[in-house]
A protein has these predicted regions:
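Extended, low-hydrophobicity, polar/charged segments
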Residues: 1-160
Length: 160
């Protein structure tokens, strides 16, 4: 959690350092698809992780980390979180909840420290994800990220 005076990438770096987490932030051109983004970064689509913000009915949020080529399984995630209703908030609510615009969202440096749920397929790999700013991505060891956030690891996705 940060005070909002830093840029997105600076917030990511500061939070990662505070957690003892090694991240590599790169600049990259915009991509029109998951496959194009993977090609630009020299990785496979499954190694690109989407940080999705989900809103619970009590107006609290959680981060759901989902690998490329997969989507949230709403029944699985609702059961895991013990709620009857979840939704993806609109862009303005996601920004208010995290301090990041869609396409840049990451739990690192979020303006509010929401719980993190990681799909089981992400564990054990080096992944890329949003770095707090458009035109940047970060690389991180998924297991180290999971430990840094004391994240819940579970089967929360299904194929797209």
């Amino acid at each position: 959690m940060t005070d909002g005076t830093l840029t997105g990438a600076e917030r990511v770096r500061a939070d990662a350092a505070a957690r003892g987490l090694e991240v590599e932030i790169i600049e990259r051109p915009a991509a029109r698809s998951l496959e194009e983004a993977a090609e630009i970064m020299g990785i496979t689509p499954v190694d690109i992780v989407k940080s999705l913000v989900v809103k619970k009915s009590d107006d609290t949020y959680a981060f759901a980390l989902v690998p490329g080529g997969r989507k949230i399984s709403w029944p699985k995630l609702r059961a895991l979180l013990g709620v009857n209703k979840l939704q993806l908030p609109d862009a303005s609510l996601a920004l208010a909840a995290t301090g990041y615009e869609r396409g840049t969202i990451t739990p690192l440096g979020s303006t509010t420290a929401w719980p993190v749920v990681v799909d089981v397929t992400i564990a054990g790999r080096r992944v890329s994800m949003g770095a707090g700013e458009h035109g940047r991505s970060l690389f991180v060891d998924a297991d180290a990220l999971i430990r840094a956030f004391d994240a819940t690891v579970a089967d929360i996705t299904e194929p797209e």
